Amino acid sequence: MLKLIVETKTLMQSLGFARSIIEKRNVIPEYANIKLSAQDGNLELSSTNMDLYLSQKIAVQVLNEGEITVATQTLSDIVRKFPDSELTLTEIEITQLEIKGQNCKFNLFTLPVSSFPAMDSIKPEVSFKISCADFAKIIESTKFSISLDETRYNLNGIYLHIKDKEFFAASTDGYRLSISWITLEEKIKNFGVILPQKSAEEILKIVKDPKNIHEDIEILLSSNKIKFICNENTILLSKLIDGTFPDYSAFIPKSSVSKLVINRKIFADSIERIAIITVEKFRAVKLSLSRKILEISAVGEARGTAKEIITASQDKESFYEYNHDESLVIGFNPQYLEDVLKAIKSDIVELYFSDISASAPVLIKFPRNPKDIFVIMPVKV
């Protein structure tokens, strides 16, 4: 019967990842539980929500090998409140788990291990390794433009694909498009899959963890599943979205007639300030561009108006340059601009305008990040 000693901090961190996987309104008891398996000096923690399966291994002192399942939320809440640096977990008569510190003890009811689902096997058609830092970069640069419209299920995730040694991530909600990529060290078979939003969020948390960010992640792909192996001790298996992602290359503007170059932070801060006056029903900020100034303004129904002016400058900290003699007035959903400007921490951002009519998609680039591009549709103002 299971008995082990574990560092409280280490257990708490793993339970945090497990809790994130499990659906909060889970009506199936087995899927609200976590399986604990103690063997060979390790504790394996398994959690699932049917679409995702997470397995984590942490080093512990195993006094007796064994495995049990227990309510994830309850176990996590208890462990979080323990002041002790170490805890002893002991299986009691198959139906209970004892969690014991120096002066405090809990007994939790358990469910049979036989009722907990096993991780599905996967027959990979493609497998490769990249750094966790690179993978985090392409997911963070694209996750915010995933469509939330469930009727457009093929847009409810990030399109991961390889083409000619380039590993791409792309997402779109029909109003904006985000693309980020890295170059692989070796040539891999071309492929394309759609990673669900929830899966993207969970693997991003894992690769950004301090113990993983400087390691590699192995990615294994089949026709309907994707498996991530991070730092050898963490495995995330996810179902894929069964659908076809649109050919997004057709939506990327191929030419421009004018360009705005501006300090990213100055621009982002101004957009965020002016957007305060806008209302949820119709969120729009107006950009009035000329060679000398950029005027950012907005009108909020039953709220008022707001306006800010940025003057032309060649100073790095306040850089602003618009390269067309004819002025341009164009509107954007401020949230769409803010998402892009927050995703890439670069000094300078460039906006490319295809025409002066202010109705064509706008291409956004960052000179220091050439492998990230964004497209936003303007709105009427």
Swiss-Prot record:
GO MF annotation: an example: DNA-directed DNA polymerase activity
InterPro entries named in the record: DNA_clamp_sf (IPR046938), DNA_polIII_beta (IPR001001), DNA_polIII_beta_C (IPR022635), DNA_polIII_beta_cen (IPR022637), DNA_polIII_beta_N (IPR022634)
Keywords assigned by UniProt, alphabetized: Cytoplasm, DNA replication, DNA-binding, DNA-directed DNA polymerase, Nucleotidyltransferase, Transferase
Domain of life the protein comes from: Bacteria
Subcellular location: Cytoplasm
Annotated coiled-coil segments of the chain: none
Gene3D superfamilies according to UniProt: 3.70.10.10, DNA Polymerase III, subunit A, domain 2
Gene Ontology cellular component annotations, sorted alphabetically: cytoplasm; DNA polymerase III complex
Listed GO biological process terms: DNA strand elongation involved in DNA replication
Subunit structure: Forms a ring-shaped head-to-tail homodimer around DNA which binds and tethers DNA polymerases and other proteins to the DNA. The DNA replisome complex has a single clamp-loading complex (3 tau and 1 each of delta, delta', psi and chi subunits) which binds 3 Pol III cores (1 core on the leading strand and 2 on the lagging strand) each with a beta sliding clamp dimer. Additional proteins in the replisome are other copies of gamma, psi and chi, Ssb, DNA helicase and RNA primase.
Similarity comment: family membership: Belongs to the beta sliding clamp family.
Function: Confers DNA tethering and processivity to DNA polymerases and other proteins. Acts as a clamp, forming a ring around DNA (a reaction catalyzed by the clamp-loading complex) which diffuses in an ATP-independent manner freely and bidirectionally along dsDNA. Initially characterized for its ability to contact the catalytic subunit of DNA polymerase III (Pol III), a complex, multichain enzyme responsible for most of the replicative synthesis in bacteria; Pol III exhibits 3'-5' exonuclease proofreading activity.
Entries under NCBIfam families matching the protein: dnan (TIGR00663)
Protein name in the entry: Beta sliding clamp
Native species: Rickettsia prowazekii (strain Madrid E)
Upper classification of the organism: Bacteria, Pseudomonadati, Pseudomonadota, Alphaproteobacteria, Rickettsiales
